[in-house]
Amino acid sequence: MKMSDIMDIATSGLRVQRTRMNVTASNIANAQTTRTAEGGPYRRRDPVFHAQRVARPFASSLERSLRGVEVDSIASDPREPVTRYMPHHPDANEEGYVAFPNVNLVEEQANLVSSSRSFEANLLVISKVRSMAEALMRIGQ
């Protein structure tokens, strides 16, 4: 396994976790948005990931199993919005209920912490691979 393959895998993890943090931040920022351009309240979003091949076609079986990760799409949460009785709200329906986004702030904060920790882990991998490469270059000196 090449060090560049390890770096590619860790870098793909960094990109995915950055996207996950951005989507989570958007969910938190729009937790009270009752009207969007599409109509209706904001819908919570989640990134959908899939494995991505890293190795070359004629690599060994171990190297062929190496996979990075990439964002496939950003999916909207299918759960129904939360309704609250607020008759004076401009987006209230005839009965006085307003549809609010289905965003759970505790869940979003947990997602943010999880993606932050994963981002840090990928940075640590890159840092360790870099120091290993530097140590290898010093062997011949």
Predicted regions and their residues:
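Amphipathic alpha-helical polymerization modules
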Residues: M1-Q141
